[in-house]
């Protein structure tokens, strides 16, 4: 940990970039009820707001990878933070669902240049024994951003409306982009080899297992982020304050479990950590469907946040050990594309299931089954080299 913190600019710049990404991506979910009412959306269209983002995010993976290879992770990450912030500001001017989905698509397309270049930056500055911890510290930014959004956006919406609150978030994101550019730094010997499809080990079963696992991991994560606030209000009758508290608990768990997952992976191995994380997630999702209220509900929200964030860093830090450091960037980019596709599909499907069945239960059972599948597939992945 001490050696990781010897590079504070890299850690802080990456932290801020991921925090801003999370704020811009999830701010609308905290006022989704207001958006849904004003734009007259059903649950399927409400789910399309998250899916529209990840259509753009998926399409942006390869172009941003090329930009990062050619101009460096620093410029790519700062430019991406700027792009998603401007798109969020424009989302606040949406007058119909077509405009709203278009701006969400643009947010995803322009925001796709933060995470994978960040992984590349971590790989260049930290050795194999430090990467999991470093990436875990960076990803605390994601959970911190969601906590901030879950409190600030609903409070601002009372006086500014949902539109004004999202516009203000966009302006603050533009400032964040400049700060990220100041603190981040590319390493001189950073590998600048461009994306080469020959680097992708399509003949390796473990590559495909990891791709499916990433589809499930991020899809499940954003299903909770997109729908949890509305579920807590509709199914549990929580107030805005109580819902914000619950979402803060979900994301506070991520602040703790992101670095914990990275450190556990450095010590016990990514494979064991990922198997434990996915099986735990399945169990907690099933318990969530029981409709338990009171303190138990808040405990379950914490455990869901813990288990789903515990797998994030190991899911990427395992890649160099399996496929080599030189191909880690290309493999991470492809894996992240699968992850983005999962985040595109699963939130939309849950909204469709809710419209069709008038209940969230079947959707939650499906996410639990996919979590079980991810744990089983992880058992088939080869052991990474030390």
Residue ranges and their predicted role:
Residues 137-184:
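Helix-loop-helix hairpin linking two adjacent transmembrane segments in secondary transporters
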Residues 103-141:
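Cytoplasmic helix-loop-helix junction between adjacent transmembrane helices
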Residues 59-95, 271:
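Conserved MFS/SLC helix-loop-helix module at the cytosolic interface between two early adjacent transmembrane helices
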Residues 10-43, 224-229, 346:
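Extracytoplasmic
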Residues 270-318:
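C-terminal transmembrane helical hairpin of 12-TM major facilitator-type secondary transporters
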Residues 40, 72, 93-99, 127, ...:
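Helix-breaking motifs and short loop linkers at transmembrane-helix boundaries and internal kinks
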Residues 28-29, 206-258:
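Extracytoplasmic gate region of multi-pass secondary transporters
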